[in-house]
């Protein structure tokens, strides 16, 4: 038995099993998708629209997760491009790893794939694995020419299955047609007229690297003009509540200064009464406020000791 990043690996898997994914994402307590990935709720994905990249970055950094953001600036040598820069994309991550073609390795992958019930291991495999709310995230080692992981036909299937788009450390083709596809978006290394060639799909739903980020299946991604940030699913609820409570506290302090709130009123008492106007249940908000009041400030120190 081999060990990979602390995980028991019986053999190379093309598509990681639900059991492997559950072990990989053991910190998640909640519903899972049939393939084993954490299923952050659609309601939480909606609430993340009000969370800025900076707020998410600061929250994760305080948790000791310092490598969750990838810059999409077009002014550096590692720049990326976005089909619709004005449109954000938020969803649950499905990962794929592509590697340079090596025929004996590809033969091996096809044999392993057959044992997993996969008829053919190619760039269609991740696409057929998508479900609504997923974002297809793939590492193709920055390949642009011949690294076109999809065109308009596969792009249409991606959107039909996920209602989202893609984030590729690789490229796409048929940009004009993709740009006309309402609701579809892509964060990629570039565009190229070539068809995909010289690549093998080495894994689906395994850990991959996107720029400076290690991405796990089931992460939640926020993709915007400035870049992409990958949020471990176990932190999503706390992040949202942190941002929403900070906004509540700002409103509370402002209304206190204006004399709209009595000086004897405590924030927690007032905040719980406001929960009906937010996407927060009273129980959820109350539990978070109590947790914040009693939580020791040791998380960052504990994480830092791993470095």
Predicted regions and their residues:
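N-terminal pre-domain segments of enzymes
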Residues: 12-57
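Short, solvent-exposed loop/turn segments at the edges of secondary structure
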Residues: 203, 223-224
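Channel- or pocket-lining gating/hinge segments that regulate access to a cavity or pore
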Residues: 226-229
């Amino acid at each position: 038995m081999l060990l990979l990043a602390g995980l028991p690996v019986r053999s190379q898997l093309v598509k990681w099993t639900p059991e492997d994914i559950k072990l990989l994402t053991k910190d998640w307590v909640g519903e899972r998708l049939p393939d084993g990935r954490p299923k952050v709720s659609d309601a939480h994905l909606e609430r993340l629209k009000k969370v800025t990249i900076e707020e998410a970055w600061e929250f994760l950094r305080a948790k000791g997760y310092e490598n969750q953001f990838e810059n999409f600036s077009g002014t550096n040598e590692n720049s990326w491009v976005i089909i619709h820069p004005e449109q954000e994309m938020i969803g649950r991550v499905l990962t794929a790893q592509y590697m340079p073609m090596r025929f004996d390795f590809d033969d091996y992958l096809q044999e392993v794939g057959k044992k997993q019930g996969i008829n053919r291991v190619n760039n269609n495999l991740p696409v057929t694995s998508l479900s609504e709310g997923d974002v297809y995230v793939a590492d193709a080692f920055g390949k642009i020419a011949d690294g076109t992981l999809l065109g308009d036909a596969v792009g249409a299937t991606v959107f039909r299955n996920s209602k989202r788009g893609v984030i590729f450390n690789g490229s796409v083709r048929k940009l004009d047609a993709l740009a006309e596809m309402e609701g579809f978006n892509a964060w990629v290394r570039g565009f190229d007229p070539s068809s995909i060639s010289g690549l093998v799909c080495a894994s689906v739903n395994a850990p991959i690297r996107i720029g400076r980020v290690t991405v796990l299946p089931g992460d939640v991604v926020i993709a915007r003009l400035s870049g992409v940030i990958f949020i471990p699913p176990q932190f999503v609820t706390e992040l949202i509540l942190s941002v929403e409570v900070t906004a509540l506290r700002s409103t509370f302090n402002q209304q206190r200064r204006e004399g709209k709130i009595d000086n004897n009123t405590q924030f927690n008492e007032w905040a719980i009464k406001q929960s009906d106007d937010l996407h927060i249940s009273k129980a959820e908000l109350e539990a978070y406020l109590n947790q914040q009041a009693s939580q020791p400030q040791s998380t960052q120190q504990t994480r830092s000791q791993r470095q």
